[in-house]
Design a protein with these regions (language model features):
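Feature of Fe-S/electron-transfer and energy-metabolism proteins
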Residues: 1-113
Length: 113
């Protein structure tokens, strides 16, 4: 399944905003591993490339390619943004993850940072 990681804890809890609920299903384990092992950013990007993770927009942009270009950008200050805009009427693809699995979004953002 292409989105197994994104959706494995979606709607498995009555209180998805609670960190303990997310952790019950293995949430934040990957972040803890990356921090504990001091995984270099290039290795994280390579793992994302191998996973073929893609953006949820219409173009399905390759996430590793995006992260690689951000890492190579000049300057010392960088920011991580989460674009949850759904411009199409009735579109709820981002909203469903942000409401049903908000900690997965946060964990991904932290890893990407």
């Amino acid at each position: 399944m292409a989105n197994e990681v994104c959706f494995r804890t979606l709607d498995r809890s009555d209180a998805p905003w609670k960190i303990d609920e997310y952790r019950k299903f293995g949430g934040y384990k990957m972040l803890e591993k990356i921090l504990r092992e001091k995984t270099p950013p290039a290795e994280i990007i390579e793992q994302v490339k191998v996973s073929n993770l893609r953006g949820r927009g219409g173009a399905g942009f390759n996430t590793a390619r995006k992260w690689r270009s951000c890492k190579a950008a000049p300057g010392n200050r960088r920011f991580v943004l989460c674009n949850g805009d759904e411009g199409d009427p009735g579109a709820f693809m981002d909203r469903s993850i942000m409401e049903g699995n908000p900690h997965a979004v946060l964990e991904g953002m932290i890893i990407g940072a």
